[in-house]
C-alpha cells in the first residue's frame, strides 16, 4: 500500500552557486559522508553540482512523502542517497520509520528531479 509520494526539482545552476559560495560548510551540513565521498568520482564542477542537486532533490522528495519536513524529526544528513551495486538509486534514513522507499532520479543538465514513493 502506498503511504506517501513526494517530488522535488532542483536547479543545477543554483546548486553549483551554493557549492562555489559555501563549499565544505554547505556539503557537510546537507550531505552524508557517503554522498560526499561519491561526489569525488566527478572531475568537473558541473558534474559535481548535478550529483548534489539530485541528492538534494531526493532528500526533499523523501520528507515530502513522509509528510514531516526537515527539523521535525528528520535531519538532512540523516537521509543518505546512494546507488546500489546495479546503479539503482536508494535512500537510507537514520532512525528509519519502516517504510519501503522507491526512488527515481533524473537530470537534463539544468535541473535535477527526484520522485519518491513510500509503501508498506
Swiss-Prot record:
Single GO MF annotation: magnesium ion binding
- Keyword tags: Cytoplasm, Fatty acid biosynthesis, Fatty acid metabolism, Lipid biosynthesis, Lipid metabolism, Magnesium, Metal-binding, Transferase
Q: What is the catalytic activity of this protein?
A: apo-[ACP] + CoA = holo-[ACP] + adenosine 3',5'-bisphosphate + H(+)
Provide the primary localization: cytoplasm
Name one matching Pfam family: ACPS
Which Gene3D superfamilies does this chain map to?
4'-phosphopantetheinyl transferase domain
Read off the InterPro entries from this record. 4-PPantetheinyl_Trfase_dom (IPR008278), 4-PPantetheinyl_Trfase_dom_sf (IPR037143), ACPS (IPR002582), Ppantetheine-prot_Trfase_dom (IPR004568)
What start and end residues bound the annotated signal peptide? none
Q: Give the UniProt subcellular location, in the record's own words.
A: Cytoplasm
- According to the UniProt entry, what is the EC number of this protein? 2.7.8.7
**Any idea which positions bind Mg(2+)?**
8, 60
* Known cofactor(s): Mg(2+)
One GO BP:
fatty acid biosynthetic process
Q: Sum up the protein's function in the record's words.
A: Transfers the 4'-phosphopantetheine moiety from coenzyme A to a Ser of acyl-carrier-protein.
Protein family per UniProt: Belongs to the P-Pant transferase superfamily. AcpS family.
Question: What is the name of this protein?
Answer: Holo-[acyl-carrier-protein] synthase
Organism annotation: Anaplasma marginale (strain Florida)
Q: Which gene encodes it?
A: acpS
